[in-house]
Amino acid sequence: MAFVWLLGALVLIQNVLGLERTVVTTLSEGIRYSRLVTLLILVGPAEEVIFHGVIQRSLEDVIDVWAAILIGGLLFGVAHIDPAAMGGGNLFFYAAQGGFGVIVGWIYARSNNLVIPALVHGLFVAITTALPLVFG
């Protein structure tokens, strides 16, 4: 039950602070790259701690590891939903986020080390953030 509250708190914090929108706004304005770097360094590791270090690990105590990975990935995708941007291609984005959550959940289950999925997450965010900058 605690992980449900934690997930709700994460979604609320992300939406209230506008963390994902901040990255897009920062890029479109072409300023505050130090703020962008800070987001890239902090958001990925923080999400890994919450979704895999807390939620997935807690679920593994009561259900099968694969079920915990799949539920954790689903919750990861749900946490990235922006109700204001629902519909169209955004649904694919949310499904991809869930799939990414499953992949890094599997990496965590295999390695039993949060640093590895946090690095993968940070690299993924860095690449997907840099591509629009490079290819406009």
Q: What do these predicted ranges mean?
A:
Residues 69, 79, 83-85, 89-136:
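Functionally important transmembrane alpha-helices
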Residues 45-50, 54-59, 78, 82, ...:
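Active-site His/Glu-centered metal-binding helix of metallohydrolases
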